[in-house]
Amino acid sequence: MNSTPRTVLAVITACALLASLSAQPAPSTISHWQRASETPIVSPQGEAWESAGTFNPAVALFHGKFVMLYRAQDRAGTSRLGYAESTDGIHFQRTLAPALSPLTPYERGGGIEDPRLVQFGDTYYLTYTAYNKKDAQLCLASSRDLVHWQRLGVILPAYKGKWNVGWTKSGAIVPEKIGGKYWMYFLGTSADKTDQMGLAYSTDLVHWTEALDTPVLPVRPGKFDARVAEPGPAPILTNDGIVLIYNGADDKLVYRTGYAIFDRKDPRHLIARSSDPIFAPEKDWEKTGQVPNVVFVEGAVPQGDRYLFYYGGADKYVGVAQAEVSGATASTAPHK
């Protein structure tokens, strides 16, 4: 009875090792990474829906404004999405009420977590994790103004994957069609209990099919991503390929930032991967919070020859960093 799980685990482990060995070290596509603010730009406040944590944000440009959707958590552990605006990308003004609160059976209890944004035409698509205290599942919503949202439901159900046998989370959608399909990197849990990155495709953004029988970006023993390899914001399209910022956790669950480059004509093909992290928790507010020692990038906005990268610090605060991205093309992030 126990031979099948061991066989599956052996196959997944072998495929992961082969994928890691075949990828080359990443070129200097991303350089001069540094904090754009030494202190948090959004912090918990009040006694209600955002009292325990404000973290893991998605950000888009809309009519000249920076619009942030961030995960807000109350002291009971329920998450909602807060809304904030800025003219400079650093100083944000928040609304009094959340933008999205748990309503559906698959959201009630734990709530709505970890947003990521991508734009196609005049429509913004929001991937988020719905958690009902039992299952975490990847969901989708759409909007034309980033204020009024239409839920489109669960797009990758938990426990029904190929290699991923648990929850589904963290959908980072490539911001252009490739081969007539939409492509999305996501987080799944493999048979060995590690959280690894998968890939799915769709023709309508609502119905998704896994593209591979194994993780597209596996964890690497002994590295900064030994336990977790989780997508960050929507990938950036560059001359080098599809650049995906991702969040890696080591065996001590310290979260750091890396990046991977996939073939622009074939999102399944990993070209290169950073050997070492490009960003790590250093500030006190990145080391101490609801979860210690975490920097977790989820938002990216182009600004001239650089990008602003928005991240969660210790599952409690929002921070912002900046870096240069060489060879980035025009349609690389949500904008209008």
Q: Language-model segments: which ranges?
A:
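Bacterial N-terminal signal peptides that target proteins for export
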Residues: 1-11
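Bacterial N-terminal signal peptides
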Residues: 9-20
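Beta-rich carbohydrate-recognition and catalytic domains
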Residues: 21-110, 118-227, 236-293, 304-336
